[in-house]
Swiss-Prot record:
GO biological process, one term: fatty acid biosynthetic process
Gene3D superfamilies documented for this protein: Isopropylmalate Dehydrogenase
EC number(s) reported in the record: 2.3.1.274
Organism: Neisseria meningitidis serogroup A / serotype 4A (strain DSM 15465 / Z2491)
Stored HAMAP family: PlsX
Protein name: Phosphate acyltransferase
NCBIfam families linked: plsX
């Protein structure tokens, strides 16, 4: 039985999204038990109304809610009995294998980092997310906003934890291909930080394929793409905006005149397939990667379907025992990085 902790009060709409999303998820997974944190009276009423299988749900009452615009340090210091904090605590205490929240991103990252700590050798956790491609391939992108300014060593650490996660979830694919997001594919391109990161990764034990431009990411050329949080967040928002723009443009074009409306009827199966493939809700659920516990961040403005997919992400990670596999692989990879760094420093010193 897989047990997940759910922050039922988090997100823009709270219970209106988390409860139906959790109910649909439980109906699809008879091997899951949920610990839902929040106001017990409100939560029980909402679950009953949704027809949730109460025999597989424990309610953990909390008296506080972290606001979506609340400062992370304030939430950490003053909201120790919040639905978010208590959900993360379930993972720390071994009562749940993963926690899911649609709440304040900064507060969740601060809380998870404080409660769970980072994997030994990993300085900072990163926000990671699987992105679609033009094939059935998916690519893990990180960091998507947690760390806007990174050292080469930290970027290399992101590459390590990203590679280990993909390998844990998809061992049949072999060693994941790792790409470094840059303004060009040549190793002379980019900032000093990116150039130094390139050299570290080149001498590591990772399957480093070199620099990758953002316009290639959705073509499945890499299994893991690494960037600092500033570049990664801009990249993600650009992709999301482009998908939304194209979807709207196609819809408006097919509705513009009678001929196009008739053409839309003929193209309906293909359009439905495209819509399903690009549905952002299917890729909801960012991973706070690098922690000694599985924490999934759902988009705060998602609907019940999107929240269900965030629970799916937590479920798959918990079921694959990804965390223990990551921790085992990280030590070896980080040792190789230290060797690469020493060689790099020696070469610089010899100039």
């Amino acid at each position: 039985m897989i047990t997940l902790a759910v922050d039922a009060m988090g997100g823009d709409q709270g219970l209106a999204v988390t409860v139906p999303g959790a109910t649909a998820f439980l109906q699809a997974h008879p091997d899951v038990h949920l610990i839902m944190t929040g106001d017990e009276t409100q939560l029980r009423q909402a679950l009953t109304a949704a027809g949730a299988p109460m025999e597989r749900i424990d309610i953990c009452h909390t008296a506080q809610i972290v606001g979506m615009d609340e400062a992370p340090q304030s939430a950490l210091k003053n909201k120790k009995d919040s639905s978010m904090r208590v959900a993360v605590n379930q993972v720390k205490e071994g009562k749940a294998q993963a926690a899911v929240s649609a709440g304040n991103t900064g507060a969740l990252m601060a809380t998870a980092r404080f409660v769970l700590k980072t994997i030994p050798g990993i300085e900072r956790p990163a926000i990671a997310k699987f992105l679609p491609s033009d094939t059935d391939h998916v690519t893990l992108a990180l960091d998507l906003g947690a760390n806007v300014d990174c050292t080469p060593e930290q970027l290399a650490q992101f590459a390590v934890i990203g590679s280990e996660l993909v390998h844990a979830l998809h061992p049949q694919k072999g060693q994941p291909r790792v790409g470094l997001v840059n303004v060009g594919t040549e190793d002379i391109k980019g900032t000093d930080t990116v150039k130094q990161t390139y050299k570290l990764l080149q001498n590591s034990k990772l399957n480093f394929i070199g620099n990758i431009e953002s316009n290639s990411i959705l073509y499945g050329e890499a299994d893991v793409v690494v960037a600092d949080g500033f570049v990664g967040n801009v990249m993600l928002k650009t992709i999301e905006g482009a998908v939304k723009f194209m979807s709207g443009a196609i819809r408006r074009e097919f509705q513009s005149n009678l001929f196009n409306k008739l053409a839309a009827v003929a193209a309906l199966p293909a359009l439905k397939g495209l819509k399903n493939k690009l549905d952002p809700r299917k890729f909801n659920g960012a991973i706070l990667l690098g922690l000694r516990g599985i924490v999934i961040k759902s988009h705060g403005g998602t609907d019940e379907t999107g929240f269900r997919y965030a629970l799916e992400e937590a479920y798959h990670e918990a079921k694959s025992a990804s965390l223990s596999k990551i921790e085992q692989g990280v030590a070896e990879q980080l040792a190789a990085l230290e060797t690469a760094k020493a060689v790099q420093n020696e070469n610089v010193g010899g100039l």
